[in-house]
Curated annotation (Swiss-Prot):
Protein's name in the database: Tetraspanin-9
Ranges facing Extracellular side: 29-45, 97-234
Family designation: Belongs to the tetraspanin (TM4SF) family.
Pfam families, alphabetized: Tetraspanin
Membrane topology: Multi-pass membrane protein
Transmembrane regions: 8-28, 46-66, 76-96, 235-255
Lineage: Eukaryota, Viridiplantae, Streptophyta, Embryophyta, Tracheophyta
Any one of the GO CC terms: membrane
Main location: membrane
Keyword entries, A-Z: Glycoprotein, Membrane, Transmembrane, Transmembrane helix
GO biological process: auxin-activated signaling pathway
Stretches in topological domain Cytoplasmic: 1-7, 67-75, 256-272
Length: 272
């Protein structure tokens, strides 16, 4: 049992070390070569994650295979808090993504999105001007509105209404159905006179760098994509959490074996 648990912890952490190398390399590459806001947003988290995994993996390998008890204890201490963090984040992700979905519009294939339908916590994130300015820049650089305009260049209004738009395209590239604007192209609409209950109608602009990027519908479209992504992450986290618990249990066995081995040596016994 001594050799099995220690060796297993060492092998598992060796694979974690191998995993950390491409993550760290990608983060460094992005920090040096990134040209867009979206790419630059990912470099520091990836570097931090890569370094963290590398340090944890080295501690696990050395602590278990070289029988360094204090290092293995530190490894288990960090692993315990990592399990708690992953568990809390998974629960949090399911809670904040439990609300909100697209609204079906009669006579149209696409859905529209209302910011009020999503959780208060998510709403506060996108209503923060600093956060949204960064997100908006990222959305604009992704050029999905430009691509939509190319795909629907020859569409009539009836053709456009048959398009199954993504949440981004529906929320950011066109005005709300409440505005009742006149269709010219997918990203160009003639405004109608009068007042509108939906504040997004006043925010709509035909200029390509504006469109509806500041609209509540665009924020809602972003949250709908974020919601779907977080749910996938939460499911992956459950699997990851199970693996963490298994590795932690093996680490506890290895820690106990290290102590027994040290006790045996101090008393003139050999436990190998």
């Amino acid at each position: 049992m001594v050799r099995f648990s220690n060796s297993l912890v060492g092998i598992l952490n060796f694979f974690v070390f191998l995993l950390s190398v491409p993550i760290l390399s990608t983060g460094i590459w992005l920090s040096l070569k990134a040209t867009t806001q979206c790419e630059r947003f990912l470099d520091k988290p990836m570097i931090a994650l890569g370094v963290f995994l590398m340090i944890i993996a080295i501690a696990g390998v050395v602590g278990s295979c070289c029988r360094v008890t204090w290092l293995l204890w530190s490894y288990l201490f960090v692993m315990f808090f990592l399990i708690l963090i992953v568990l809390c984040f998974t629960i949090f992700a399911f809670v904040v993504t439990s609300k909100g979905s697209g609204e079906t519009i009669q006579g149209k294939a696409y859905k529209e999105y209302r910011l009020e339908a999503y959780s208060d916590w998510l709403q506060r994130r996108v209503n923060n001007a600093k956060h949204w300015n960064s997100i908006r820049s990222c959305l604009y650089e992704s050029k999905f509105c430009y691509n939509l305009e190319l795909v629907t260049a020859n569409h009539t209004v009836s053709d456009f209404y048959k398009e199954d738009l993504t949440a981004f395209e529906s929320g950011c590239c066109k005005p709300s159905n409440d505005c009742d604007f006149t269709y010219i192209t997918s990203t160009t609409w003639n405004k109608t006179s009068g007042t509108h209950k939906n504040s997004d109608c006043q925010l709509w602009d035909n200029e390509k760098h504006k469109l509806c990027y500041n609209c509540k519908a665009c924020k809602a479209g972003f949250l709908d994509n974020l919601k779907a992504a977080w749910k996938r992450v939460a499911i992956v986290n459950i699997i990851f959490l199970v693996l963490l618990v298994v590795v932690y249990a093996m680490g506890c066995c290895a820690f106990r074996n290290n102590k027994e081995d040290r006790y045996g040596r101090s008393n003139g016994f050999n436990n190998s």
